[in-house]
């Protein structure tokens, strides 16, 4: 039996033009974006991955499929050595996902054109370690948030455009009262308010944030913590000034001044609420050192509900968290909370022992 010569698959074939390589890179990246969109990822997540890939490509200077483990060693060990851990982890994950896509979809085509075998340059030896922790957000105190909304409410009497200002005020009040995410609030429709449900009425959050590709998660949020009064005032006294038909299907709860092509009110964007809240906080909370964002108000809501006696399971359901460990990161207690809990425990123990024979 004769032996056949085995050709090394890593040897490049006939060279291709730069235009061919550029076209292949464009097609592959477009396919990557489309595949991630088909998997249900948000536009922001896909754009973030593409940005990471473009930055690696700009440093490497060649198609990404030419990267080898020594190249990844140099990039993550030297170029990104002093960058934030979250940046290194996100960039490494984007690169691993991209190479997984190349191996599944384009391994044969890339080898046929360039002679290279696609292999991920990130392995167990150079993979950035650690996990990305959420940024700690300490909310203002209840007195400070009360002062913020009290001053904001007084501005409504003298503002130039009452309806948009009252809408922004109402939306931010909702974030602080029942812990809605800003995107969830923007996507609410007027019929999502279910006045007849429960003791206080409920809010049908149809576009809750999902996790691990689950898609939007719906939930019912009770209008506790004065949220029902806030919404009732807005719907009865403010909403009609935007000139939309309340019987129209899909009419937004928080309409914009801008109109759609058919003359109906469009939906407000989250940047409008972010800028309005930042402006109000800068005016009425000048002593607060950090930026007050909608997510900070969400942390404030969780902390106040916990201090008011609501258990963590109920807060988890209100905020729409998949894991109670996430809810625990949202609860910020005062510095004397441990001492107060110890004293309360001693008082309960003394009450149980009272009356027993000595």
Question: Language-model segments: which ranges?
Answer:
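Conserved tyrosine-mediated DNA breakage-rejoining catalytic core shared by Y-recombinases
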Residues: 187-231, 237-240, 332
């Amino acid at each position: 039996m004769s032996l056949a010569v085995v050709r090394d698959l890593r040897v490049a074939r006939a060279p291709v033009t730069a235009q061919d390589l550029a076209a292949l890179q464009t097609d592959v990246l477009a396919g990557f974006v489309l595949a991630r969109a088909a998997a249900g990822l948000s536009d922001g997540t896909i754009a973030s991955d593409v940005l990471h890939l473009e930055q690696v490509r700009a440093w490497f200077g060649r198609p990404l499929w030419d990267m080898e483990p020594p190249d990844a060693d140099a990039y993550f060990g030297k170029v990104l050595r002093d960058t934030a851990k979250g940046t290194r982890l996100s960039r490494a994950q984007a690169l691993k996902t991209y190479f997984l896509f190349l191996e599944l979809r384009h391994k044969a085509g890339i080898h046929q054109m360039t002679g290279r075998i696609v292999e991920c340059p990130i392995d167990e030896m150079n993979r950035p370690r650690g996990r990305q922790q959420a940024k700690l957000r300490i909310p203002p105190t209840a007195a400070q948030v009360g002062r913020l909304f009290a001053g904001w409410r007084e501005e409504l009497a003298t503002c130039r455009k009452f309806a948009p200002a009252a809408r922004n005020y109402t939306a931010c009040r909702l974030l602080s009262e029942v812990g809605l995410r800003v995107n969830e609030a923007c996507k609410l429709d007027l019929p999502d308010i279910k006045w007849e449900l429960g003791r206080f009425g409920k809010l049908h959050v149809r576009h809750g944030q999902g996790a691990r590709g689950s898609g939007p998660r719906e939930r019912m949020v009770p209008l506790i913590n004065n949220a029902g009064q806030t919404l009732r005032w807005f719907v009865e006294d403010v909403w009609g000034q935007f000139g939309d038909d309340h019987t129209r299907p899909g009419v937004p709860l928080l309409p914009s001044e801008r109109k759609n092509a058919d003359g109906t009110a469009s939906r407000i964007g989250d940047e409008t609420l972010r800028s309005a809240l930042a402006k109000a906080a800068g005016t009425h909370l000048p002593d607060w050192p950090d930026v007050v964002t909608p997510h900070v108000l969400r942390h404030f809501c969780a902390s106040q509900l916990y201090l008011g006696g609501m258990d963590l399971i109920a807060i988890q359901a209100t905020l729409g968290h998949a894991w109670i460990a996430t809810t625990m990161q949202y609860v910020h207690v005062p510095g004397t909370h441990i001492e107060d809990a110890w004293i309360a425990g001693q008082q309960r123990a003394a009450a149980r022992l009272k009356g027993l024979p000595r």
